[in-house]
Amino acid sequence: MNVIEGKLNLTGNERVAVIASRFNHLITDRLVEGARDSFVRHGGKDEHLDLILVPGAFELPFALEKVLAQGDYDGVCCLGAIIRGSTPHFDYVSAEATKGIANVTLKYGAAVTFGVLTTDNIEQAIERAGTKVGNKGFEAMTGLIEMMNLYKNIGA
């Protein structure tokens, strides 16, 4: 059986965008740093990594649509932090951000990863932004690198 998979290395020529929400910036700033760390560790050049900031997670799909329509990037990493509160707002924002990112990704057939935390409380978010459970921004960028290379291997 022939196995086709993406590798975890970059040539240094790849252009990548990170789209991150500013809301809950104490968390998302750490996710962005994790993504940047992964990009550089795997051979990416810092000057080929662009950070696009949006107000909140709900706006991520709209920015993603614009970025993919321009066709300037080899991949896009979406980052955010949605923390449950006492109202249904969490459910609406997390559902729409998730569906929106998935729909735009499918529309363009692009290498995109979803690094949006959806947590019950601030403690869980902190744990996933570089403490107990690792850094989900790092993981999202690592997944993006693998997917960009997989797309090259399957001719996408």
From Swiss-Prot:
The UniProt record lists the keyword Transferase: yes
Database matches in InterPro entries: LS (IPR034964), LS/RS (IPR002180), LS/RS_sf (IPR036467)
Chain sites annotated for binding 5-amino-6-(D-ribitylamino)uracil: F23, A57, F58, E59, A81, I82, I83, F114
Entry keyword set: Riboflavin biosynthesis, Transferase
Enzyme Commission identifier(s): 2.5.1.78
Pathway(s) the chain acts in: Cofactor biosynthesis; riboflavin biosynthesis; riboflavin from 2-hydroxy-3-oxobutyl phosphate and 5-amino-6-(D-ribitylamino)uracil: step 1/2
Membrane-crossing residue ranges in chain numbering: none
One GO-annotated biological process of the protein: riboflavin biosynthetic process
Pfam family, one: DMRL_synthase
Protein family membership: Belongs to the DMRL synthase family.
UniProt-listed PANTHER family: 6,7-DIMETHYL-8-RIBITYLLUMAZINE SYNTHASE, 6,7-DIMETHYL-8-RIBITYLLUMAZINE SYNTHASE DMRL SYNTHASE LUMAZINE SYNTHASE
NCBIfam families attached to this UniProt entry: lumazine-synth
Protein name: 6,7-dimethyl-8-ribityllumazine synthase
Taxon lineage: Bacteria, Pseudomonadati, Campylobacterota, Epsilonproteobacteria, Campylobacterales
Encoding gene per record: ribH
